[in-house]
Amino acid sequence: MTASKKLTGCQAWKALAAHRRNWKLHLRDLFAGDPGRGERMTAEAVGLFLDYSKNFVTDETLKLLLRLAEETGLRGRIEALFRGEKINLTENRAALHVALRSPKGTSIVVDGENVVPQVHDVLDRMAAFAVQVRSGSWKGHSGKGIRNVVNIGIGGSDLGPVMAYEALKYYSDRSLTFRFVSNIDGTDFAEAVQDLDAAETLFIVASKTFTTLETMTNASTARAWLLQGFKGDEKAVAKHFVAVSTNTAEVAKFGIDTANMFGFWNWVGGRYSMDSAIGLSTMLAIGPDNFRDMLAGFHAMDVHFRTAPFGVNLPVLMGLLTIWYNNFFAAETVAVLPYEQYLKRFPAYLQQLTMESNGKRVTLDGMEVDYQTSPIYWGEPGTNGQHSFYQLIHQGTKLIPCDFIAFVEPLHPLGRHHDLLMANVFAQAEALAFGRTLEEVTSEGIPAWLAPHKVFEGNRPSNTILAQRLTPETLGKLVALYEHSVFTQSAIWNINPFDQWGVELGKVLAQRVITELESREEPELGHDSSTNAMIRRYRKFRERME
């Protein structure tokens, strides 16, 4: 048996495949046959409540999924993660984002050294800097305080900070303005700074290597913009730029005082870094105490994931359900539906976390898989999505499992708003599960010709995740829940969720193309005929504009 077939050849996988072939139950049947199902098929930990009763599962299904987790060595993989073993095999690194939120006094050893004190040294430096900026004691080059913060990064250096800022805006200092620049499209930078005063603006340049093309292009443009505001005075850079990086030489060359460089480690992957120094903009927005509360939330979920039995382990259950639909029901996507406007960027954040992690086609030992890996994650906040894509989920031909996320207590209690919002959460999950039969439609006097259009098949599965209130701590728990669900999936699929070689080829080709686009002479093109034609067309139109 080849390495790639170890999964599909294991007994639990075969049993699940047989179980799926015999599956003929509708969610209506499952609830009718088990009056206590809605209370029984739930799990609760660290302040998060998961209702997974509206899924295609019986006790037998759960038993087989849990057996799959055991047979594929999930327990050992979890321990290897937390022990700091080099589980990122292709880069020969640990993947120790859990160390970023480990409390002081704990120990996680990498290459013979406890890294937790290093983590807290950086956090303490971040906190001291945040206090200076937030209090107004950090002065810009003109002597004015900082009123605007612009985070420049891309990928994990942008998606996490943007999501966290939006999610925790309720807790932010509203006297500070925050902007985020990631796209190399000049519009992104131009719009971010068009109404800002250079004398009151601080740039955070977030790039581990300080060589990332998009980030350093935007950083150079920001530097030029700042110097224009200070009539070319190079000394201004040190008071208006800080770096999140590990490349001291490049940071200094840029003009940033290396005392204002906040580092992190090669065992922190970009999409797992929002709770590292990459979260400096988050700390500036919400303050050090709230940031530490967020870290405490992450850590609480870490402990739960590591210690809870799989049958009540929230990330494990969610990961197993994803595998059940992805690999046995051919469901290609997961809809993430937060009924909380502050979480409007959460689905976009999860897109990188899930698909960059598990969008892999070979196993850890380099063998091509013979099963599907990561589904596509997407979504929008409710109730907005109800008036756009929910139609397809309810009555379309695709099976789309959904994650509903909601909070019992509103941050803005305005009249009936929150009750109406929560009514929609519960109603949508119910409608997806149970639908509306032809008999129910016709009993209401609907004409026969119209009745089929009003039938809802139902049998659309969903999870509902409830928490008391959206707080920094709750956000940490929620992000860690999905981090560990992703890890659970990767362990069972036997893939590496911590590398991202798929982003490299386009970068390499882009370097070649930019040389051809900017050449003063007509370049000799060696691409395919389509790419060659587009390059020539672009060059021709650009020449007309010059």
Swiss-Prot record:
Keyword Transferase among UniProt keywords: no
Catalytic activity: alpha-D-glucose 6-phosphate = beta-D-fructose 6-phosphate
UniProt xrefs under Pfam families: PGI
Protein's cellular compartments: Cytoplasm
Cellular compartments per GO CC: cytosol
CDD domains for the chain: SIS_PGI_1, SIS_PGI_2
Assigned keywords, A-Z: Cytoplasm, Gluconeogenesis, Glycolysis, Isomerase
InterPro entries: G6P_Isomerase, G6P_Isomerase_C, Phosphoglucose_isomerase_CS, SIS_dom_sf, SIS_PGI_1, SIS_PGI_2
EC number(s) stated in the UniProt entry for this protein: 5.3.1.9
Protein's GO biological process: gluconeogenesis; glucose 6-phosphate metabolic process; glycolytic process
GO molecular function per UniProt: carbohydrate derivative binding; glucose-6-phosphate isomerase activity; monosaccharide binding
Annotated Gene3D superfamilies: 1.10.1390.10, Glucose-6-phosphate isomerase like protein, domain 1
Active site: 356, 387, 507
Pathway: Carbohydrate biosynthesis; gluconeogenesis; Carbohydrate degradation; glycolysis; D-glyceraldehyde 3-phosphate and glycerone phosphate from D-glucose: step 2/4
Stated family: Belongs to the GPI family.
Function: Catalyzes the reversible isomerization of glucose-6-phosphate to fructose-6-phosphate.
Record HAMAP family: G6P_isomerase
Name used for this protein in its record: Glucose-6-phosphate isomerase
Native source organism of the sequence: Syntrophus aciditrophicus (strain SB)
Name of encoding gene: pgi
